Swiss-Prot record:
This is Putative septation protein SpoVG. The lineage of its organism: Bacteria, Pseudomonadati, Myxococcota, Myxococcia, Myxococcales. GO terms for biological process: division septum assembly; sporulation resulting in formation of a cellular spore. SUPFAM superfamilies: SpoVG-like (SSF160537). Belongs to the SpoVG family. Keywords: Cell cycle, Cell division, Septation. Gene3D superfamilies: Stage V sporulation protein G (3.30.1120.40). Could be involved in septation. It comes from Anaeromyxobacter dehalogenans (strain 2CP-C).
Amino acid sequence: MEITEVRVFPVNEEKLKAYVTITLDHCFVIRDLKVIHGNTGLFIAMPAKRRKDGTFKDIAHPLNSDTREKMERTILAEYDRELKKGAAAPARATGTDPHED
């Protein structure tokens, strides 16, 4: 499995830093991953749905730690590139909807 596209949609919140959409093997899209700033730094949160009891259940997630680490490295690298690109641009469009294609 290859991550063939990563789209980062930065947000300016205290903990939530970006929404992310990834494409796997040019044929499968996963939306609503999140870049979160936690106590130990940045990490990726998988898309989740709130259950009736108030807990969250992942909608999609890696089945092993190697895949999770590969996804996290790839997504965080693209997040860093997006931040640098945004810092270099004098005027940046805001309000981009991560659900549009």
